[in-house]
């Protein structure tokens, strides 16, 4: 397998995941102010709620990953982020926004640790500089997506700010499934020594 084929899916997955997180992190306060009429100070507190949910979720994900099947973590993560984005798109209240923000933050949280674990297992003998390239590309997704979202939001409604991560979460889910299928198909049969 060519090197690009080996790491294309994890690379795209991290690109999309960083784009999702940074879109919400960058646009959430403006979304709350324009969509719900929440004060700028309160919207910044709600942004802190998002980052707190993401941080606490990542710590909890590290604790439960050895004990819970990764597919269950993934399905729960995707369901939470989908539901959170849908709630944020549809809500008219501060309570709905807070619930959606918690679900989005908690839903995004386990994806990064799951992918990093997969990348480490897939490329155990690679130089650390290789991983630097992967994560630099991922950060590029986090930088480009909020920038592009500004142009999209200008031409459409501010609700697109939460629709974008909804679509991105679907892409992350599909890419994670592809990575797991590929790892199952390329694994040596049980009982045989490679």
Protein language model regions, located:
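Extracytoplasmic gate region of multi-pass secondary transporters
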Residues: 4-48, 55-56
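Residue-level signature of mid-helix packing/kink "hotspots" within the transmembrane helices
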Residues: 51-59, 142-143
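Helix-to-loop junctions at the C-terminal end of transmembrane segments
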Residues: 57-69, 153-154
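Structural signature of the two symmetry-related core transmembrane helices
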Residues: 72-87
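Paired small-residue
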Residues: 84, 95-103
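Intracellular juxtamembrane helix-capping segments at the cytosolic ends
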Residues: 109-123
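A late C-terminal transmembrane helix in Major Facilitator Superfamily
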Residues: 124-158, 165
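Symmetry-related core transmembrane helices of the 12-TM Major Facilitator Superfamily/SLC fold
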Residues: 162-179
